[in-house]
Amino acid sequence: MTRMSISVKNLKEIVDMLGTIVSEVKFKLEPNGISVTAVDPAHVAMISLDIPKNAFSEYDLDAPDEIAVDLDKVKSVIRLASSNDTIVISKDRDKLRFEIGTIIKSIALLDNNSVTTPRVPQINSDDYVILSKSDLEKGLRAAEDVSDAIRLTLTPESFSAKSTSDSDESEMLLPKDMLKDISCSQPIKSSYPLEYLLKLVKSISSNEDIKISFKSDYPLSIEFSFNSETEPISGKFLLAPRMES
């Protein structure tokens, strides 16, 4: 029988993160852990997560499998738990069974064929910046009431996030000495939809450093991880650029 145990905190973060862009996902179960990739209906944003076996306190798998679920139903289960609880999850034919203390709840699985798993494109760029998640979120929040787009600029000496409208302007400027790492041979800039970017960044609950890679008018890649009991869960956001006239 497929059976696993995971903390409520980590399950909630996984589900909330995926829920920023989709309502249904398909998890791929392998002996070394679980992976999931989702893309929003407009094909603007993509999330990819790798959840290693050691992120679970228990992980028993009869054979490789795929499980498609309605995220809102999983959220309803999570709401029954306390933040320090552990949820035991098992597959029972066409249902997913959750055990939380004295509560047992089952939800119907979706047809695997009804949920597609997108291919993760290769986004290659030698230009990147590593900074704290909180610094990026502050810059995005400052721009929230200015415009629906934000322009990221990377130079060999700094990283900035700027948003402008006819009447207002917001800019976050981080010089090289305030960044954890930077790689840039010549200035690059690209604009992205602010709503998507802020929603994705806010869904990362930890304040670990994140890596942003992009090129001028090119998709944005954000690599991050968040803590589990034993081994970090790693993830990547991809976001299409906002083309400017």
UniProtKB/Swiss-Prot annotation:
Give a single Pfam family match: PCNA_C
**Cysteine pairings via disulfide bonds:** none
Q: Which GO terms describe its molecular function?
A: DNA binding; DNA polymerase processivity factor activity
Superkingdom, natural source: Archaea
Q: Which InterPro entries match?
A: DNA_clamp_sf, Pr_cel_nuc_antig, Pr_cel_nuc_antig_C, Pr_cel_nuc_antig_CS, Pr_cel_nuc_antig_N
Transmembrane regions? none
Gene Ontology biological process: leading strand elongation; regulation of DNA replication
UniProt keyword list: DNA replication, DNA-binding
Spell out the family assignment given in the record's similarity comment.
Answer: Belongs to the PCNA family.
Function, as annotated, reads: Sliding clamp subunit that acts as a moving platform for DNA processing. Responsible for tethering the catalytic subunit of DNA polymerase and other proteins to DNA during high-speed replication.
Q: How does it assemble?
A: Homotrimer. The subunits circularize to form a toroid; DNA passes through its center. Replication factor C (RFC) is required to load the toroid on the DNA.
UniProt cross-references to PANTHER family, sorted A to Z: PROLIFERATING CELL NUCLEAR ANTIGEN
Q: What is this protein called?
A: DNA polymerase sliding clamp
Q: Which organism is it from?
A: Picrophilus torridus (strain ATCC 700027 / DSM 9790 / JCM 10055 / NBRC 100828 / KAW 2/3)
Name of the gene encoding the protein in the UniProt record:
pcn
